[in-house]
């Protein structure tokens, strides 16, 4: 017997989330400008931690903007937070924990909260193959006039990487300079071309070294942030090609989409998740465009750290591979899925598959690995 995880999760209020986070170690919370609560990063800290763990109530998802760089639901958060304190719990135990803290019983004797294991497993398996409905979530938009504040000229850093003036102008890339703030500006638009956020590629060395290379831009008193897990960068420009070819290539960063715009022009069928994670919202957006093939092209894994043994590094590398398989599993019930993996040393550590040029990208495409349903389900 086990809890109905979806019913428990959907029933949670903001107050319930407060209770759960307080119990996990975040004694209070802050708020962002959109009214989303921000907690301490209990996901990867046993105590303390910065206020970089955001909760998006509509999506029922957390996002850690520091070490995790990842999206996850409340059950996964519980598993991670408990693990930081040396307590390993199962997924079902995490559901029970959440239900207990939130006081979810759904009736006398928990009759509605518990359901038969065999039945839920069968129905969940069958449910994977149902056609995904088109999504209708619309993110808040910002006034377009903010774009007039930016210097409308490309920065030499990106020009030096081979991105053309034409593409940088087409994607509205600019530059913002004020005391204590400097960086390349990257407007983000949704499928309907609405301005929903602006990210900044910092040019301040101290910020880059501290891990804040890409962050939401603040102009005056307005922070131009958005839920990146609910939008894919570049789709306002590439959706027609994606629909025409019925395929999509998913990168981590905006810059890779820009490079492919120069490589392929109107045949560019790429987008970017702006992290190393693919959310269910990303999947549903792409399925709504009718894709039949998905290519996952995340950055090459990091180099070994100082004093890290080869054995430990290989363990971490395998964990990264398993993570990619789990991301692929979001798509395998619906479409053909491929992963671009550099076995031949064509890329440097942390390179995007697009960073070494069109020929290298196409060589990686030729060597792509197809992921089956069983492989994606590890």
UniProtKB/Swiss-Prot annotation:
Lineage top rank: taxon: Bacteria
UniProt GO BP: DNA replication
An MF annotation (GO) of this entry: DNA binding
InterPro entries found in the cross-reference section: DNA_primase_Znf_CHC2 (IPR036977), Phage_SP-beta_YorJ (IPR016622)
Matching SUPFAM superfamilies: DNA primase core, Zinc beta-ribbon
Protein name: SPbeta prophage-derived uncharacterized protein YorJ
